[in-house]
């Protein structure tokens, strides 16, 4: 039923970053800050030296920051000013019925990155 078909690849649930940031901050033992509109591409240009300090301070794996993140993609994801909605009807009708809680999985993956010493 799915051969030759094109599907929206989305989990189907909706979340807003403003609701997720406090949970991410809590995971890292931090207070969530307010909104500061800026592009990460510009803001993070000077982040490599800070990242090197964090690697040393927290005994992290020595991964260069540019190997871990695309600031252009992050700007796109975090800067979207509309709710992203994509129908999952077609893929469910074709039998793809599994789903996950996107917020929960995000927090689990971030916790896993901490365990692997990728992030502090």
Please provide the spans of the model-predicted regions.
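Residue-level "edge-of-site" marker
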Residues: 38, 104-105
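Short, charged, surface-exposed hinge/linker loops at domain edges
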Residues: 81, 116-120
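Mid/C-terminal beta-alpha module of Rossmann-like enzyme folds, strongest
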Residues: 1-73, 87-89, 93, 110-116
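Conserved beta-strand edge residues that scaffold enzyme active sites
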Residues: 99, 105-106
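A conserved mid-domain beta-alpha-beta active-site/ligand-binding segment of alpha/beta enzyme cores
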Residues: 74-78
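Residue-level detector of family-conserved "landmark" positions at structurally sensitive sites
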Residues: 35, 101-102
